[in-house]
Amino acid sequence: MRLNALQHSRASDKLIYTLHYLALSHGRSVGPQRIEITLDLTHQDFANLTGLTRETAATELNKLKHQDVITYSKHTLYQLDLAKLTAMLNDQYISDIQIKL
């Protein structure tokens, strides 16, 4: 599988797509439209996954936190509002994602 979104998108697009993927593949439901990622991930881990710097990954995660899309603590427990995250995926924020199998 090739993810063109991670090659050409903005930093926010890369992070949103990665969070959505992690929520679906490694998440567990903790409430209505709330998913907890069951991996122990740091800002550096997100940077490595997306090809961003640690600082950029942290900045983008904080933006999503202020938009109430994601909550997390310094103990790296990530909970996502799946409805908001999916809306961002379907919105104009991520217009150039292509997945080729």
How should these model regions be labeled?
Residues 1-16, 97-101:
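A small-molecule sensor/coupling module
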Residues 25-101:
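Phosphate-/nucleic-acid-contacting segments
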Residues 16-24:
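Amphipathic, well-packed alpha-helical segments that form the structural scaffold of globular domains
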